[in-house]
């Protein structure tokens, strides 16, 4: 059983035991269960939910109103919906949990959700945590930060550009002017690296000159900006001018000042359409809450509170773990939105659509309206006279069927918090303004990816047909003018997209007892040799490569350099260079192994096991003097490291060194006998770290060995070698 599943089962048992004894579980336990359920849904990797702060040692049992849990309703497939699975007017658990048995700290009385204190806490979290939000696994990020999704987005954008070059929708491009690709909420910069790299590699087949593309990383925090500016992998792109950066608040700012070029982007400054990328952003921007009940739209007001009696710092990000939110609903006028820079009729059109849709069934509807995302997109699209391409991936819904029923919104807590993005509303907004949307119809998906296009031609937006299936018909008619975009979206998102890749690697890691090396190589190729995937399956690779057929070894050797070229330093606990060094040692390419051990020492820091493994490389190459130096360096960092002591004695004996004061001294000649085995790893990967001689693998039926060594193990590692 997967680790995350075991954790949920154990936590659930604790919860059930408490209930059996008439004791209500604490908000901390509720938050932990909610986070683990997110892990089961695929929204967090086990390493990511395990990277947050540990649960408190002492748990206070607190009564909550009505004994309700803080979990959202889930369908039979386990997919999380966008709303809490109960109706709670006036009071609700819209966060980690609520507490009625002790005083609730009211941070804010009932107010419109988009103007509430909730979003100030969100800004405070990312401002204070900075890049640590991703590097320490506080916020899940692998699903949107890997080589596969970077390549997928680049292919979709390329399809859009190909259509524009052919004049689709009147969206002509000027190849002499820059094409700005603006990423909102860049965060760590890892996705930016992958997408820009993929675009540059498409130079020979892209219909628009790649050298005129400028990728712009933006975020509102100074710490993130500084991290990008100092990241060595990004420096070549910055120096070439194809990458630029800016501090930009997507909620409030109206212009973007590029730090490298000094260009000021604002209304009417872009000749070519603006291209926008937004992953895991829209779920963190302000939303409004609506319900449609008995043919009337109502707004949801929220009172933000904490289960803790007092909160001296109302912007303390830790409050997110103690959220105790209440909801109330009231009727709204027809002109609810009155100050939206011309978008008032479009917002009204969308709300009217939901009222009409709800009237076709019973039970009403509950809607999160992504007003923050729509405002941010509206401002950006003025840069290019309302001609834009947008691609976004997030946890959300694009099917209005998911909004049926009267329920309070579910707020998922995972270090920070997020809500389900209403991609249907965003698509309706673009359609209302003369554009169109492409949605992935897949229901079971942790990451929903949608693409939106605005052509600058609002003609026809006043034809009066905006309810029922009228919007879908407009989408189909307009998107048909962009056949290459449709084809690229279908291939790279619908047929097998970023969510599918995430599910595949996750299942192979958690559900397969021992994946074969051949299947791991296939996964690596599918994921463009993503370094995180390599790191996840490093044990499989190292344990099976010695018995692999020559063809499979060659496939790995061709791909490993790609792993390194795709490496974006973020989490120093994932020392990819060190693991690549171990791989090369395992196939007896000692010079390559040494190169990556040196890279590991330079990028992550010196480690006694790294020096020990370098000593083994030099020993295997017959350079006993360098082997001796590295074993001594290992012992200098860790005098109690027994393996280095053993190898140091062995080297001294082979050098015929007389002992001085009980220690050998260096002289003598080198042995040409290679060191047997594989090098040490830094982190134990199994209860027993001792190496066992692998059983020779039988060749597949019908496949002949390329050489006498095929299917046979390399010489076994020394018994004193285990993990770092």
Regions picked out by a protein language model, each given a short descriptive name:
Residues 226-268, 347:
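S-adenosyl-L-methionine
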Residues 606-610, 636-649, 659-660, 677:
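Boundary/linker segments of alpha-helical solenoid repeat arrays
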Residues 2, 9-55, 72, 78-178, ...:
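N-terminal charged/capping segments associated with class I S-adenosyl-L-methionine
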Residues 348, 352-602, 606-612, 616, ...:
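Rossmann-like AdoMet/SAM-dependent catalytic core
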Residues 206-207, 212-219:
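Conserved SAM-binding motif I beta-strand of class I
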Residues 260-294, 363-371:
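A short SAM/SAH-binding and catalytic strip from SAM-dependent methyltransferases
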Residues 278-341, 411, 415:
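A mobile, often basic/glycine-rich helix-loop segment
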